[in-house]
Amino acid sequence: MFEVWRSFLSEIDPLEPEEMLFRPTSEANSIAFLVWHCPRIADTAFHRSQGMSTVWEQDKWYGKFGLAETDTGTGFAPDQVAAFRPTKKLLISHLESVQKALDDGLSQMASTDLDRPLNPENPRATLGRHIQSIVMGHGFFHLGEVRFLKGLQGRPFAR
């Protein structure tokens, strides 16, 4: 599951700050935004499904990023994305913190826990499917965006 986040780290490793903030149009996301948004969404999706507070809340990451406690990046206006200018070090620390928390949380679960329905009216909507679609599917979608943004800047994909 964490291959997507290892890939994010590999993709951003050689980038300069201006490359992290590059947006090909005023409506586009930056690499920095995407590398923050994906673990932020995964943190929320996993911990809320468990009835727990998020790493974002527990460790007050919102203060470190200068954002609201409720911000996830979903629905951000272009000017909000443009104003989002974190350091690579902060992004990496946040991603690694969320990854550790999710790894710890998942390692304490039995495989049958993943079959638990999140909504009694829709028993097919299980925790496992939720993790697969939100954490993995969403992450790989945005990883593709990161690679595209690198390519637009003449940077190769990480190998």
Residue ranges and their predicted role:
Residues 70-116, 130-135:
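Acidic/histidine-rich alpha-helical segments that form the ligand environment
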